[in-house]
Amino acid sequence: MSIVRMTDLALSGKRVLIRQDLNVPIDQGRITSEQRIIASLPTIRVALERGAAVMVTSHLGRPKEGVWSEEDSLAPVAKRLSQLLGIEVPLRRDWVDGVQVAPGQLVLLENCRMNVGEAENDEALARKYAALCDVFVMDAFGTAHRAQASTHGVICCAAIAAGGPLLMAELDALSRGLKHPVKPLLAIVGGSKVSTKLELLSNLVNNVEQLITGGGIANTFLAAAGYPIGKSLYEADLIETAREIITVAKARGAEIPLPTDVVVAKQFLPGVTATVKTVDAIVADDLILDIGPQTARHYAALIETAATVVWNGPVGVFEFDAFSKGTEVLARAVAASSAFSIAGGGDTLAAIDKYGVADQISYISTGGGAFLEFLEGKTLPAVAALQARSG
């Protein structure tokens, strides 16, 4: 991918502004998950070790522009960065018009979404960001799909704009998995609604050899194939769309395997009685809440033969133990596979954590919405801007 990389630049004595994704959950001043902070450390350390004067900013939550609030302040993040790096990390509240920072020093710049014009990608604000630095580094893949002043405008205005190690690792992995995959390519797409994954499904069906669906999405495909689904979650108005996707797959010689058995209950509650049924035996008051054991074994066998696996979404209500087996079998199959595997999406990450297979997945994307848009085949604004600057 044609993007200037931070790691290829001489940074000694340079003022370097790094846009990170430090949007961590905070409860009463306490950070409850520091995954994104940990992920940012290698980039920051490289810049410091190379003698740069380092400024880091990020968004946190959705503050009102032009209004500082303690609730949306990066103060807890500054404190944690200081502890992890073993250096003082001062937080600068008013920084748009200038920041004092020396080579080898790190300062954290307050929540960039508090700045008026950030969300609208205001050019004047972007130029002020650019004036702060000799080198701007975009390292926040999780916000690469948003055209904002700190993720897009500044890239266009900065003297030098580069991709940070975290961003480039994400793009390299996604390109390997989707743009230049070793075949066969298998995708797992779960979730409650076809409508939220329609562009994703439509893009993947043109690239994969197998497309496994789960959750309410699979129910819609079952209904499209003429199977009864009882009172299960599905989208009647997208049955024809599901049929069109199946037709595209068949025309390419690709496969969208449907469940042959499922796990059902009468109510959507933890602790209810779970029953395995074949898909042609569903009655009016059944709720399909997981794939059945026969289907899980079949899908696991398909995963075993894949060379590249892309996973987004569970195949059942894995939060309830009675309906977690399908997702567990697939998670363990992906983990055991020799394929290059990419997983992303909040529920997917939760499943990976639940079954303890993170170390066996080739790449876990923390990108959220940016990950989904990449899977949909969309061009991410920040990535497009970095590519334009590399020329």
From Swiss-Prot:
Binding site for substrate: 21-23, 36, 59-62, 113, 146
One annotated GO molecular function: ADP binding
EC number: 2.7.2.3
Gene Ontology cellular-component terms listed: cytosol
KW Membrane (keyword) present: no
Catalysed conversion reaction: (2R)-3-phosphoglycerate + ATP = (2R)-3-phospho-glyceroyl phosphate + ADP
Pathway field: Carbohydrate degradation; glycolysis; pyruvate from D-glyceraldehyde 3-phosphate: step 2/5
Enzyme class at the top of the EC tree: transferase
SS bonds (residue pairs): none
Subcellular compartments: Cytoplasm
Gene Ontology annotations of biological process type: gluconeogenesis; glycolytic process
Highest taxon of the lineage: Bacteria
InterPro entries associated with the record: Phosphoglycerate_kinase (IPR001576), Phosphoglycerate_kinase_CS (IPR015911), Phosphoglycerate_kinase_N (IPR015824), Phosphoglycerate_kinase_sf (IPR036043)
Keywords carried by this UniProt record: ATP-binding, Cytoplasm, Glycolysis, Kinase, Nucleotide-binding, Transferase
Residues annotated to bind ATP: 197, 319, 345-348
Family affiliation: Belongs to the phosphoglycerate kinase family.
Subunit organization: Monomer.
HAMAP family: Phosphoglyc_kinase
Protein's name in the database: Phosphoglycerate kinase
